[in-house]
């Protein structure tokens, strides 16, 4: 027989303490959704079952005890940290679910310069870890647009990819080791070693599991030298997307690794670069790192783009200004809410993966449907 809502709350309070179990209705409503439902959220409309409680977890041991209890009584759990997700994965679609909030597990455990690794609990905001590293001259190399909001556990659980992935890779390329708690409360740890010599890489069972298989409590990621003084910015306007895709392919095939490589169509370019796009497509690159490598990368980009006479370079300062305003923090989220209320319009980003041979066809098919 399943436990009642009240019984679930009472037993959770016994496990973690009453101060860590939140049952305020406003909080429960907010925690029944993620940013996929930002339009109804802005209008105060919540149609999903609200959770029985939100638990502010404080340690791996607490996560283990809570999951053991929930597993025994078949209670649905929704792991949550920064809550910046936009895919509906944080919704409490099952009655009397419990939201497992790890944002209070927010300690940076170790910054290991010799081994070029940083270890943090699941609730450490990426921006906090990044700032701590930058003070020492290092970086994670991971920079999704949600950097001011996202936290380390969620980034790994959702297989996050950042804006510098062409150079540094995605989160799955950065994770060295981790700690996680399975559904029955068993704590498992994957060691921080550079390579496994045999068997499947079990990190990839956990990375991207979306909270369905386990609760990630601790993460160790690679770190890199941070040298923003060497950043080189390149921006071009061009007539068509096909040319842009060809340029991107040539740069990658030649072995260059800019940290940023972006192509905007005319509509998107006009939205982001009204001051110079002039109704054309926009191609953007950034080279960074060791000054010799950055210089060689920049020269390679310029040489390849020069093979396409239709491309017109724009002032690098324009691209640098764009770069410095990429991320979405609380201020931009608040401003977006005001704009949605005012206009009734909103947008989402959809990520698509495709090979060089099909990516332009995918683009044309999608944009023709939209238009």
Spell out what each predicted region is.
Residues 1-68, 86-116, 266-275, 321-348:
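N-terminal flexible segment immediately upstream of the FAD-binding catalytic core
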């Amino acid at each position: 027989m399943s436990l009642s809502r009240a019984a679930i709350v009472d037993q959770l309070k016994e496990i973690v303490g009453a101060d860590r179990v939140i049952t305020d209705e406003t909080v429960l409503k907010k925690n029944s959704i993620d940013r996929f439902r930002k339009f109804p959220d802005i209008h105060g409309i919540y149609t999903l079952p609200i959770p029985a409680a939100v638990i502010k977890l404080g340690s791996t041991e607490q996560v283990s005890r809570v999951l053991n209890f929930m597993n025994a009584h078949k209670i649905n759990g929704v792991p949550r940290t920064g809550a910046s997700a936009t895919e509906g994965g944080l919704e409490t679609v099952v009655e009397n679910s419990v939201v497992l909030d790890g944002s209070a597990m927010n300690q940076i455990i170790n910054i290991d310069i010799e081994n070029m690794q940083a270890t943090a609990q699941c609730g450490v905001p990426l921006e906090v870890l990044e700032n701590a590293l930058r003070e020492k001259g290092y970086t994670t190399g991971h920079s999704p647009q949600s950097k001011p909001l996202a936290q380390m556990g969620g980034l790994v659980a959702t297989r996050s990819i950042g804006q510098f992935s062409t150079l540094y890779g995605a989160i799955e390329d950065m994770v060295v080791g981790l700690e996680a708690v399975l559904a029955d409360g068993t704590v498992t740890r994957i060691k921080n070693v550079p390579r496994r010599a045999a068997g499947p890489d079990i990190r990839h069972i956990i990375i991207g599991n979306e909270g369905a298989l386990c609760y990630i409590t601790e993460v160790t990621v690679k770190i890199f030298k941070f040298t923003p003084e060497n950043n080189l910015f390149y921006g071009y306007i061009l007539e068509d997307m096909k040319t842009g895709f060809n340029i991107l392919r040539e740069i990658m095939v030649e072995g260059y690794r800019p940290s940023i490589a972006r192509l905007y169509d005319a509509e998107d370019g006009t939205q982001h670069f009204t001051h110079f796009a002039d109704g054309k497509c926009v191609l953007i690159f950034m080279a960074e790192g060791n000054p010799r490598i950055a210089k060689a990368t920049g020269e390679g980009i310029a040489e390849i783009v020069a093979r396409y006479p239709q491309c017109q370079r724009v002032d690098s300062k324009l691209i640098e200004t764009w770069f410095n305003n990429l991320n979405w923090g609380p201020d931009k989220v608040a401003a977006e809410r005001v704009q949605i209320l005012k206009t009734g319009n909103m947008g989402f980003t959809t990520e698509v993966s495709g090979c060089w041979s099909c990516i332009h066809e995918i683009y044309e098919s999608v944009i023709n449907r939209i238009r």
